């Protein structure tokens, strides 16, 4: 902790570069500009050389030290000069001015809350702000509704005690009790009239450069390898750059729908990596209880569990790991993107979507949500909706009618009608697949996928780096022509073709498996009793949020195999356990937990 007059800054460091001299806070030559920082800057060498050519004296050899000097040169626009993943606070002692900045994609979290009298408290971790006097640990009904619709709460307002997220690519400026935020970057396509070969070369160059930038480290470094095309490309490029075998790590489960060990072995053999596997056979009840110790906001993405487990294994050997996260967002790999186009075409034929969907719904209903009949029914139901509602219907967990049925009368009265997922997400910023990519980059990516990755990895002190989420890679991805996004049923066409020479043939055209766990089996087996005790118990009933008889019906339908509610039950279980752990439990004394300015 460092007291700087009206500002107090605190920091806890994971040492990755400049191990000996990279302590924080960092200052300029006079000590008038002070910075703390979470994350990594990948271009700090170039930035340092530029600053030194302008007469700045930058100490040490790492990235943090450049930040105060970049602020001196660029003022409030300083984040635009930096490339990496970061949450940064800069205190200008002379002006008594605080600047907060978050990286372009939202890889590193940054939360803040406005205090009475014009003060402000901020922190990387939400739980630090729970300790600030005056912050009420309460979940707004609208936030609960959004969570059940999407499995996460989208946007800047978390709906918890007035706490907000600083949006990705934004800077917050506090001075004399006044606050305003503004963007310093926006994900926009760059129209280019290029031949296919030129596009593919641009993809190769941007992805290769992104991987190369993320190999700078003064500690052991490896990669999380699934055998999917994204992580395989990342590991292949790492192997080309490395002088020693790359260390790779894979997690598997005894369910062929999720197990990717054999595919990962193919990639590991192809690139000569030093490979480690973990078969996930934990006590699910114990694992769920561990989740609540580090997940300080409600998140129903079950992939956080295997991410946590593989991070634990990797951290025994390395401090930094590269991942394949971002391939679907940057290069249009999600099936729902293609489904939107199909739904639009099907919807042009009157009556067909609704009739066909009802026919598919008449099939035995215990099928898995990812089964072909289930996906076909969702597609046809989507086609029958107005265009603006289609995308939300494909990504929702609890549809609005089911949420209306689920909510207790008093809670429902405080909320009003449940909002559709499309309303919660807002309209895509542009038509077509590029607009959907940008919509996901605005909501799902920073508020779900990156929350999952950051919380799970940081709980084990492992730093994850995602080259396919480099902002320059994303800019190329949203600029591609549709012919290089989808071809038939295959997505990520540009990525597949650009690196066809690198990916082993047996992996090049395989479909997406997903990084999940067998929730359906869990809620019919080892987690069934826990779920019943937690969701139907007195503590849950006393909240007055959900109708117990509807929750009981969902549990029963799932247990009998009539429906697969595994994902919905998981979201409900996480919500209740999160409220117990973070809204009800006693927390440590509040002194010194969050950085503050008054």
Regions found by a protein language model. Name each.
Residues 104, 309-367, 444, 449-473:
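Active-site adenylate/phosphate-handling loop in enzymes that bind or generate adenylated species
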Residues 221-230, 255-256, 302-305, 330, ...:
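Glycine-rich loop motifs involved in handling phospho/adenylate chemistry
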Residues 292-294, 335-342, 589-590:
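Short secondary-structure boundary/capping segments
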Residues 95-97, 217-219, 262, 314-315, ...:
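Short hydrophobic "helix-edge" motifs at membrane interfaces and signal-peptide entry regions
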